Structure formats: C-alpha cells, structure tokens
C-alpha cells in the first residue's frame, strides 16, 4: 500500500508523569487509519528503557498503574532507546502517510505532543501541526449532550496500543451518535 495523504496517524504515549521537563516517555504506539477510521496498519509498540532512578521517581498513581499493566518491567528489560523508537516509528509511518500531512490523532494529544517535542522532535515533526483530539469532542459532548456519554465506556488500561484502539472506537461512536455521519 502506498503512502496516502488522507490517512490518519494515531498515537499514544505512556509517561512517568505529566511534566515533560522532569518526566520521560515509557511507551509509544501508533496506528494508521483511513479517513473513515478503518485501521489499516499497526506500528511498533515500543517500551523505552529508562533507568531505575527515573522509574523510582514516578508518583504513586503511575507506579500503581504502570506496575499493574506490566509496563514498568517491560521498560526495565527493554533495550530500546528513544532514538530507536523514533527511527522505527518513522520507518513505519513513512510506508502509510507522507511526512507533514496527518494531524496527530488520539486522546489528549496535546500532552503527547509536548513530550514528543521535548524527547522525540524528529517524530513530532512528522505530523502536521493540527490535531484530531478525541478528548475535545468528549468534553463538548459532556457539556452539550451528557446523555450520549452513557453509550461509551472507556476501559482506561493505560497501555498505549489498547488506548489508541479505544480512541478510534470512541471517535467512531461520536461520529455515529453526535455527528450522525
């Protein structure tokens, strides 16, 4: 399949916390969909090695959730660096989407973009400057038509690939129930 400018890149990061000045990326996953939100390809799911010092500095919430999911152990045993993750992810994305055309898609992608800008600038530059942020739609629906929210429940696994799949399903739900397209 040739790279298609209409395809969308979906991304999720798991991090040690919310502040890129002190926290680090633990995991990255990407998916590519067509413009109708059909999944075309799954990119590499990469746990990025971080030092024991970085992992120990995580707050209780992150320790609990990333520990329960097994991510902390995957990060400890990983041989992948941030540079490896950048290269593998760009290699994958280049097969499906030309550089600079896809918005960054996902939930709370502004947060992901902050971390990419700090630690994976070359990957952040692969995206268009625009975002398709499912969180924005969710926040509007919660305020304007809260009954609709009862129809979609997130699992909240805090595993990058599963979170992306859930973001796509959530946008499909809003497309069908809110936008009625």
UniProtKB/Swiss-Prot annotation:
The lineage of its organism: Bacteria, Pseudomonadati, Pseudomonadota, Gammaproteobacteria, Alteromonadales. It is found in: Cytoplasm. GO terms for biological process: DNA metabolic process. Belongs to the oligoribonuclease family. The keyword Hydrolase applies. 3'-to-5' exoribonuclease specific for small oligoribonucleotides. CDD domains: Orn. Keywords: Cytoplasm, Exonuclease, Hydrolase, Nuclease. NCBIfam families: PRK05359.1 (NF003765). It comes from the Bacteria. Its EC number is 3.1.15.-. Residues 8-171 form the Exonuclease domain. It holds the Pfam family RNase_T. The active site is at residue 129. This is Oligoribonuclease. GO terms for cellular component: cytoplasm. It comes from Shewanella amazonensis (strain ATCC BAA-1098 / SB2B). GO terms for molecular function: 3'-5'-RNA exonuclease activity; nucleic acid binding. The gene is orn.
